[in-house]
């Protein structure tokens, strides 16, 4: 390959904050109500137990967790000395201004508009729609992890 050919090939990386989506932590340091990545899904730990060191190795940590977006239950067993990924999870509150074509029109506390989040198809989505029909101002909690976002709760704004 000549120098000219190499210059013609351009590679663009996705723009981002530079922050990692996950960070490693030792299995023995995990705690109930914490977060963990199981099978590529961000999950909240609902139950944990540790088995004793066996004849052939390490103590094992048994983790039961629920996907923070779908509510699906996952289980993982890992040696207590091994590392496991923990997702960087953030929660932000938005005021729902409108729903258009199945997408929420959201406003954050700083006045920034967000319009790329789909209206949930579950009870939360129905509740948002009902509040808007009644002229109420829904306030939603949006959770972000592993590059995904989802509405996890709704309440009436006090404004």
Swiss-Prot record:
Post-translational modification: Lys-55 undergoes hypusination, a unique post-translational modification that consists in the addition of a butylamino group from spermidine to lysine side chain, leading to the formation of the unusual amino acid hypusine. eIF-5As are the only known proteins to undergo this modification, which is essential for their function.
PTM-bearing positions, type Hypusine: 55
Any one Gene Ontology molecular-function term assigned to this protein's record: RNA binding
Main localization category: cytoplasm
GO cellular component, one term: phagocytic vesicle
Cystine pairings recorded for this chain: none
GO biological process: positive regulation of translational elongation; positive regulation of translational termination; translational elongation
SMART domains for the chain: eIF-5a
Pfam families the record matches: eIF-5a, IF5A-like_N
Compartments, as annotated in UniProt: Cytoplasm
UniProtKB keywords: Cytoplasm, Elongation factor, Hypusine, Protein biosynthesis, RNA-binding
Task of the protein: Translation factor that promotes translation elongation and termination, particularly upon ribosome stalling at specific amino acid sequence contexts. Binds between the exit (E) and peptidyl (P) site of the ribosome and promotes rescue of stalled ribosome: specifically required for efficient translation of polyproline-containing peptides as well as other motifs that stall the ribosome. Acts as a ribosome quality control (RQC) cofactor by joining the RQC complex to facilitate peptidyl transfer during CAT tailing step.
NCBIfam families per UniProt: eIF_5A (TIGR00037)
Similarity section: Belongs to the eIF-5A family.
Stated name of the protein: Eukaryotic translation initiation factor 5A
Naturally occurring in which organism (per UniProt): Dictyostelium discoideum
Gene of this entry: eif5a
